[in-house]
């Protein structure tokens, strides 16, 4: 950075620019955007290409800012990742080498993006969110202080097809987004599909284990717990404080009210309208499920 500024100074590119750079910090550390920002841009030659940057005064937000590595993409100075020149990234955000941030993405203050991660166009990530390695995020907004573990995929198309009048398999359009609230944690290799007729939503403080599948148009309330290998089909609505045990399944287009606990390996095939504990296939109130198990053991002359 010092060498670049010195070359700008020695070549006398712009006298007014010299005064701005020498008398003001290059990046101010404020976290809030100002509607009265003004832009400062500069360029200089380098052995890797032309270095370009655009800095908004009165804010820590920055677009561009590094060595050009491909048309429209720059090497981000904090971590060495590759970022599109139109992406808006706070100077305190860390984008590790090997990560890619696409056009018009927004990364808030103190965001950490791990190597191999791809942040798609127009993705919005809130402050202090940590994203692991080899994550794919597209068509999505993520709130503050979230944790996204390695291998997560968010915002890809949901599984929607139909057979037309000619017998051809046709894909249903998947055009909406995923909206993730604040302080959400998503375990490794979990997949969350984008919406088709409504957004896929995960509300604040929900925690999701590894290897969970969440289909398109699903709405999950706040403070829910989803254990490993849970599968939720499309267009499901889940209330607040719901806990789904490991390998539990929920069929499409059903609703689960708040404060429900579902036992491991259970399957919800119809709406659950009252809070409580449920289990079995199909899921029923837990005491009924236990009676079913006892009857089955007696019928088969097994010891209880």
Swiss-Prot record:
Kindly state which keywords UniProt assigns to this record, in alphabetical order: Acyltransferase, Lipid A biosynthesis, Lipid biosynthesis, Lipid metabolism, Mitochondrion, Transferase, Transit peptide
Q: Where is this site: Participates in a stacking interaction with the uracil ring of UDP-GlcNAc?
A: 9
- The EC designation for this entry is 2.3.1.-
Transit peptide residues? 1-47
Q: What InterPro entries has UniProt attached to this entry?
A: GlmU/GlgC-like_hexapep (IPR056818), Hexapep (IPR001451), LpxD (IPR007691), Trimer_LpxA-like_sf (IPR011004)
Q: Which GO terms describe its molecular function?
A: N-acyltransferase activity; UDP-3-O-(R-3-hydroxymyristoyl)-glucosamine N-acyltransferase activity
Q: Name one Pfam family in it.
A: Hexapep
Tell me the residue numbers annotated for binding hexadecanoate: 209, 213
The pathway noted for it is: Glycolipid biosynthesis; lipid IV(A) biosynthesis; lipid IV(A) from (3R)-3-hydroxytetradecanoyl-[acyl-carrier-protein] and UDP-N-acetyl-alpha-D-glucosamine: step 3/6
One GO cellular component this record assigns the protein to is: membrane
Tell me the residue numbers annotated for binding UDP-N-acetyl-alpha-D-glucosamine.
159-161, 217, 235, 253
Name the GO terms of the biological process aspect: lipid A biosynthetic process; lipid X metabolic process
The organism's superkingdom is given as Eukaryota
The active site consists of: 216 (proton acceptor)
Please report any disulfide bonds recorded for this protein chain, giving both cysteine positions. Answer: none
Q: Does the keyword RNA-binding apply?
A: no
Q: What happens when the gene is disrupted?
A: No visible phenotype under normal growth conditions, but plants lacking LPXD2 do not accumulate 2,3-diacylglucosamine-1-phosphate.
Q: Which reaction does it catalyse?
A: a UDP-3-O-[(3R)-3-hydroxyacyl]-alpha-D-glucosamine + a (3R)-hydroxyacyl-[ACP] = a UDP-2-N,3-O-bis[(3R)-3-hydroxyacyl]-alpha-D-glucosamine + holo-[ACP] + H(+)
- UniProt subunit comment: Homotrimer.
Which family, according to the similarity comment?
A: Belongs to the transferase hexapeptide repeat family. LpxD subfamily.
The molecule here is called Probable UDP-3-O-acylglucosamine N-acyltransferase 2, mitochondrial
């Amino acid at each position: 950075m010092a060498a670049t500024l010195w070359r700008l100074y020695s070549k006398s590119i712009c006298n007014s620019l010299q005064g701005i750079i020498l008398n003001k910090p290059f990046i101010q550390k404020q976290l809030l955007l100002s509607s009265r920002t003004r832009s400062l841009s500069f360029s200089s030659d380098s052995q890797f290409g032309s270095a370009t940057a655009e800095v908004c005064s009165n804010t820590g937000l920055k677009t561009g800012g590094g060595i050009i590595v491909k048309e429209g993409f720059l090497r981000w100075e904090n971590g060495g990742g590759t970022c599109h020149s139109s992406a808006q990234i706070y100077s305190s955000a860390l984008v590790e080498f090997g990560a890619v941030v696409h056009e018009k993405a927004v990364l808030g203050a103190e965001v950490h993006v791990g190597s191999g991660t791809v942040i798609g166009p127009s993705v919005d990530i809130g402050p202090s969110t940590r994203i692991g390695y080899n994550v794919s995020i597209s068509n999505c907004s993520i709130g503050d202080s979230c944790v996204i573990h390695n291998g997560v995929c968010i915002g890809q198309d949901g599984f929607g097809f139909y057979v037309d009048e000619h017998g051809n398999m046709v894909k249903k359009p998947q055009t909406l987004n995923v909206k993730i609230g604040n302080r959400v944690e998503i375990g490794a290799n979990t997949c969350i599909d984008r919406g088709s007729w409504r957004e896929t939503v995960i509300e604040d403080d929900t925690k999701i284990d590894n290897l969970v599948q969440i289909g398109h148009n699903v709405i999950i309330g706040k403070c829910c717990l989803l254990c490993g290998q849970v599968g939720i089909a499309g267009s499901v609505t889940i209330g607040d404080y719901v806990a789904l045990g490991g390998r539990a399944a929920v069929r499409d287009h059903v609703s689960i009210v708040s404060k429900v606990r579902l036992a491991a390996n259970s399957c919800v095939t119809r709406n659950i309208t009252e809070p409580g504990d449920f289990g079995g296939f199909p899921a029923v109130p837990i005491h009924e499920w236990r009676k079913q198990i006892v009857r089955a053991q007696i019928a088969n002359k097994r010891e209880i």
